[in-house]
Curated annotation (Swiss-Prot):
This is Deoxyribose-phosphate aldolase. GO terms for biological process: 2-deoxyribose 1-phosphate catabolic process; carbohydrate catabolic process; deoxyribonucleotide catabolic process. Disulfide bonds: none annotated. It comes from the Bacteria. The gene is deoC. The keyword Lyase applies. SUPFAM superfamilies: Aldolase. It comes from Aquifex aeolicus (strain VF5).
Amino acid sequence: MIDVRKYIDNAALKPHLSEKEIEEFVLKSEELGIYAVCVNPYHVKLASSIAKKVKVCCVIGFPLGLNKTSVKVKEAVEAVRDGAQELDIVWNLSAFKSEKYDFVVEELKEIFRETPSAVHKVIVETPYLNEEEIKKAVEICIEAGADFIKTSTGFAPRGTTLEEVRLIKSSAKGRIKVKASGGIRDLETAISMIEAGADRIGTSSGISIAEEFLKRHLI
């Protein structure tokens, strides 16, 4: 049996969420045994002050990834200082599409160097990439030294597909972990993504997924 809860990065990234809602979100995620919560930089200090077991993840350059490198670095450093243990970094998709691969790698390396204690996940936005670009994205993330390649911000025109997760997994050959994100809203989809090779699941439906898992397995 796959304990889906241990794969979930439960996201609370909508701009209208109040601090009270973030607090309740963190407490509920922890109560359900969810692995991590993922929040915006403004909410990291609050989430970290509440979290006891659940990991705290922060998005960087979210959701477009087109901030200047210096801004991303500062954002990442401050997030870790505020208590973030993991960083989900949106890479510069425009630079990648422009084949400025050295720039993409160096930007990521600079962020990683300044936040050595963090787990680094790079969001590459697979819904905008073809098969060859996805393979290239895997190699760039590995070269930069990322811990995970993450499929999507969830802000793309569609969600992540099982085929994309399988392609990343087969291309990675065990050299980098995979976080599937985008359109994962129920337990069945989460399980399918894990079976396809996802090591982590990014979703804003983590609470309902965890509750359904517990209901089915009477834990």
